[in-house]
Amino acid sequence: RELARDLIGQELGRYNEEQLLAARAPLDLPAEDALAEAVHDALFRLGRLQPLLDDEQLENIDVNGPDEVWLEYADGTVVAGPPIADSNEELVELIRSIGAYAGHAARRFDAGYPMLDLKLPDGHRLAAIMEVSTRPAMSIRRHRFQRVFLAHPHEDNLLDMGVVDYGLAEFLAACVRARKNIVISGETGAGKTTMLRALANAMHPAERLITIENALELGLHEHKDLHRNVIALEARQANVEGEGEIAMATLVQRTLRHNPYRVIVGEVLGDEVVSMLEAMSQGNAGSLCTIHSSSPAFTFRRMAMYAAKSAMRLEPWVTYQMIEGAIDFVVFIHQHIDRGADGARRRVRHVASVLEVLEADGRIVATNEVFQPGPDGRAVPYTPPRCLGDLELEGYDPSLFHNPNGWWAP
């Protein structure tokens, strides 16, 4: 690519010489640099989409057609963005080339398979759709924190971000060390994947991990100083003959043959919930997953809904019994847009509740609310968990539960 930049520079130099010979103004330095970068992006990166991906403050990019782009920043501000293509056909071709070259394996994007999900080279998540929409559309979730911790003096961490306080960070780290199975739930964009990364980074670097995702985005295998022994698995869609599909449920079942110390499911989206619960209850203690949910309690109903739609058609009471034997804690993350005294918008994310799973009957999953929402909605200590002794063995200080207001910064 350095050679390409040199060649682009040479061509622009020749262009400027021709302009001077023709008594026309050459490109000034800023214009020349901008054109060189645009040509490089078009040839080797993602064209007009690339400058948006390079913006560290952007969190979501929604494309409703080639000329309708919406940008959502980390503080929740939404503004219109520049066009990224000149026509529907050009946008489809851009997405198709991304599917062919940018992911872990080539993925189709055509009339026969008009939906695409994949991880971009820089770790961001892309979802695209065509044919069933009036115009081709695309959404990109930028993962601003690829390497993140619960608490860390020198790296990105949830404590500094205000997602957890000191007491929560200590509690969750102890849960990970004690190999408790944890489900992270919350609405879209709440920061579930970021929390999952932070919890995973509290594990010992030598532990063997297997991650399963619909589209690779966790990236734990890319940080060898944090995770030395990782297999990253990605679901695969069928080929043009309709063959070769490998579903997430199949991959979760397969993990049991590969000696995992922990199994991590990036996002539970369907019938893989049954395989995941089986894996968690069959010796893979300390496993993690995320799931969409509007409340802590609805997390269990969401799992029951997925299991009911699976090939096994499980009754809710059966799923609840599986949850009792598989899940130790549910960490629920809440998000909202806050307006400061100056009127500026700010997206706020924080843990609102931590549930400990106790038992289940035919109707409900009984839980113990270990951390409950305080007056401002942020989680504060409420009821010590039944497994407190296990956490103490891993270095947790039980006196941290004696502060009913938590350690949140004002």
Residue locations for each model-derived region?
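Conserved lysine of the Walker
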Residues: K192
